[in-house]
């Protein structure tokens, strides 16, 4: 077998191997066997970077936004290299990536650009999605719902996302769900000028959503799967 690990992760970088299998590391450091540099954001259209595989380097256009997608591309390049793919094949595979429903899928309607990221959520992915939203055109609106399975730190983790949202260059934050009340309150304390809206549940959000959005908005929709925010995406698509 093979082991492929993120060499930029402090804990994973210490792994020496397993049953005599040494890991292949990917990351932004040139100490990794597979590393990236010259990272450029193309806004919501994606990322561009140079990938280094040993003595070979090639530029790739990743058709999904966010710095975290560069790491996914590096991991894919590492696996492809292990299994003997050429750099041309690796590049073509990454550049032909098509997001699936609920996984950072861009939906352009006559009125909005919807960033459909509603399949699941954790604190890290929430923050990453908020970072990407800042590149949107028009008003930047984040429609966020509860994150599940966070254990005893669930309140604190929702507050941390709220603080991050308050520091982001967005226009409206709409928080939905019992735990998201903590997110909304922290965001408002962090940035009193940010328009923060709280809805107790999905049904209430769906009822009032039309009054919160306007033509030209870029709208991020993200929550844990149990929140069923695909209904929010559908509502926006049909406006």
Q: Would you name each region that the model predicts?
A:
Residues 49-51, 60:
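Short beta-strand motif preference
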Residues 41-48:
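A short, compositionally biased
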Residues 12-15:
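Short regulatory helix/loop adjacent to the ATP-binding pocket of P-loop NTPases
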Residues 72:
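Nucleotide/phosphate-binding loop and acidic/charged catalytic motifs
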Residues 4-6:
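ADP-ribose/adenylate-binding Rossmann-like module
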Residues 17-22, 32, 45, 54-56, ...:
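ATP-dependent carboxylate-amine ligase
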């Amino acid at each position: 077998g093979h082991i492929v690990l993120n060499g930029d992760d402090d804990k994973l970088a210490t792994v020496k191997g397993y049953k005599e299998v040494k890991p292949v590391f990917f990351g932004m450091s040139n100490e990794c066997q597979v590393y990236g540099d010259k990272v450029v954001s193309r806004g919501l259209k994606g990322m561009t970077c140079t990938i280094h595989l040993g003595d070979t380097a090639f530029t790739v256009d990743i058709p999904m936004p966010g710095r975290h997608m560069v790491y996914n591309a590096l991991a894919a390049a590492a696996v492809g290299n292990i299994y003997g793919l050429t750099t041309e094949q690796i590049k073509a595979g990454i550049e032909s990536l098509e997001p699936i429903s609920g996984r950072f899928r861009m939906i352009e309607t006559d009125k909005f650009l919807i960033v459909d990221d509603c399949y699941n959520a954790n604190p890290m992915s929430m923050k990453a999605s908020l970072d990407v939203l800042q590149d949107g055109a028009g008003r930047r609106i984040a429609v966020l719902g509860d994150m599940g399975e966070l254990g005893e730190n669930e309140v604190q983790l929702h507050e941390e996302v709220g603080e991050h949202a308050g520091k982001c260059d967005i226009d409206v934050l709409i928080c939905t769900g019992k735990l998201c009340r903590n997110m909304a309150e922290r965001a408002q304390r962090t940035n009193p000028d940010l328009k923060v809206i709280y809805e107790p549940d999905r049904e209430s959000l769906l009822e009032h959503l039309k009054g919160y959005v306007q033509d030209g908005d870029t709208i991020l929709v993200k929550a844990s799967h149990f929140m069923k925010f695909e209904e929010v995406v559908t509502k926006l698509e049909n406006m």
